[in-house]
Amino acid sequence: MNYIDLFAGAGGFSEGFIKAGFTPVAHVEMDKAACHTLRTRAAYHYLRSAGNIAIYIAYLKSEITRDQLYAAVPASELQSIINLAIGKANNDKIFKLIDDRLNNREVDVIIGGPPCQAYSLVGRARSHNGMKDDDRNFLFIEYAKFLKRYKPKMFVFENVVGLHSANKGIYFRRMLLMFRNILGYEVRDFIVAAKDFGCFRIENE
């Protein structure tokens, strides 16, 4: 099964899906440094599957440069990383890049979660108005545009537990309304303790 990773960050979410046997179509991330990490991990997974992991190990030992590492991998693998900010200004370009990679295939899964600062308890506590004016509160609308366009069989929207209470729960209720009533998905929400799955974190998600 394939998947699209939105708000990909450095790719931690994707690592789990790849280990579970899913194939990435695209990782969309605005941060340049995070995209370098995504490309490096794409190179790792390709070289490992091709039996050429020695090239990756040479990179880890600084025996070859990052450019030399990338040169050992088909360009199509690295082109799965799309270094653009999700939003009105870039969505059409992102759609085009993803469409080209799909080549008329359907999308099985969309994963990802917008930046959590606007929803997190810590972020809201530090803000004079509880982050209510932060545009990141509404990035779930952009996420929904990808669901509407690609109609995946399922999706995983991940965020911090503070999403339940941000703006007295209004954002969360709007999100559920959009996913269920407008897009027609059966939605289940639940809290996961990351530490219960071998992660060195205390946050719940």
Predicted feature locations:
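Short coil-to-beta-strand
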Residues: 108-116, 151
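Glycine-rich phosphate-binding loop and adjoining beta1-alpha1-beta2 segment
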Residues: 20-107
